[in-house]
């Protein structure tokens, strides 16, 4: 077979296969061009999710007839010079997008240079140019793409449903819009307006906050920490969710390098590490984080789609991002999610399940035998006689405190304990419901971490060594092979037969633990990991298992002094708003929200 040169048309179709995967790819390239063109307003129109029609209009600098003719040729661009290949500030620079799109569609470009007298238009069908003509158009550029992939029907067959393809285009526009809050964006699909974002012209932080509210939502901002972190050659800003506000997937993680939306495994891992003390393994933080870095320290020319980057010093970037997120979270370490959702949970049963309020009341019913009310204004506490276990007198009684006491403490003064599990406390303008078990988990976690860090995790020798038989010899071998690492965690074990482990020492904090259950849990959990698991990673997992056993003792009756002591410890502890499984440790109900429960 003879070697020959490929035709220009074939080359463009091959390039299109790399750059243009779906309608969203076209939307991305055209919107990015509009941003690079200095636009303040960008309109996107789609029909059938872009399969039939894509129109992107802007009010940017526009093009002359000569520029228009050159723009649709391969490797032509106004955004790159020979000298600044390592100093790229624009979205595009390869000069591939327009000719690649034109090769697989029917393209019409109309453009008018700012302050020019005439507009010009060029049409391309399957990459074949027609003559440029004079047209009528406002300043800026309008690009119409019809019948995408008509020249490559095989690619057309692989497109997904209109719903899926539309979602991909929406996601692209939202990401670009987040990075450019000064630009207005408008997206219409099948004559229906799906996205309308007004550009802001205030300071950067205000612009960014409003754009995030418009794109991600007001609830996210209310449950997020602001990041503002700088080094001599690096800066990070944006918002990241508090640990109690999380998702089951990473879809709501928006990451940007020099305003370029990216999907980078290094940064995603950094996010996981930053939250590893506060989120369960299957939960993900929400964020919109913008990293500004010297362009010479990052390579964006990794893939034609430019969604991947390479850092000159990836470990430095990773560590800086982790530090920035942790600093931001520390500022809101005692904040839990807004009480709005909790109020709705209270309110819905009242609306749906309560009997009609005008139902006749039988004053002779048995209920009156159990409950009596004293409406004396001077009464401090109403006594209720219930057909259930009596609450301890010192826990159930009301305690008088002056207003200054309530102002003094963030979590207020303990008033009662429910079901030996929940503490009710009162603040100046709210009531707080605290989950004892979750609080003990967080307290234990912080305590064990502190002891490990300072070498204070003392061993407790068992009076009688405990023999634990595991379900397989493989699990026993795994624990035994990691015995030196476990020893550093104050757990001393030896092999005892084929499937058994003998335990001679446990951490002093867990001296009352069920050793059988502890070792079984360790074996089950850790056997899923590599036999050569790093000590740091092993410590992370073992601590979490320790805490589960440490906090079992939490479900018990507490005296008033014990409850208040627990509240004071929460106030002096970092990240007291959630346990290490991401459950909130408390819910605060403001008086104004409680009043809403009783409104019709």
UniProtKB/Swiss-Prot annotation:
Family matches, as SUPFAM superfamilies: ATPase domain of HSP90 chaperone/DNA topoisomerase II/histidine kinase (SSF55874), DNA mismatch repair protein MutL (SSF118116), Ribosomal protein S5 domain 2-like (SSF54211)
InterPro entries with a match to the protein in the record: DNA_mismatch_repair_CS, DNA_mismatch_repair_MutL, DNA_mismatch_S5_2-like, HATPase_C_sf, MutL/Mlh/PMS, MutL/Mlh/Pms-like, MutL_C, MutL_C_dimsub
Tell me where on the tree of life, at the top rank, the source sits.
Answer: Bacteria
Q: Which residues form the signal peptide?
A: none
Keyword vocabulary terms for this entry: DNA damage, DNA repair
Nucleotidyltransferase: present as a keyword of the record?
no
* One GO CC term on file: mismatch repair complex
GO MF assignments:
ATP binding; ATP hydrolysis activity; ATP-dependent DNA damage sensor activity; mismatched DNA binding
User: A Pfam family for this UniProt protein?
Assistant: MutL_C
Q: What biological process terms from GO does the record include?
A: mismatch repair
Which family does the record assign?
Belongs to the DNA mismatch repair MutL/HexB family.
What does this chain do? This protein is involved in the repair of mismatches in DNA. It is required for dam-dependent methyl-directed DNA mismatch repair. May act as a 'molecular matchmaker', a protein that promotes the formation of a stable complex between two or more DNA-binding proteins in an ATP-dependent manner without itself being part of a final effector complex.
What's the protein called, per UniProt? Answer: DNA mismatch repair protein MutL
Q: Which organism is it from?
A: Rickettsia typhi (strain ATCC VR-144 / Wilmington)
Taxonomic lineage per UniProt?
Answer: Bacteria, Pseudomonadati, Pseudomonadota, Alphaproteobacteria, Rickettsiales
Underlying gene: mutL
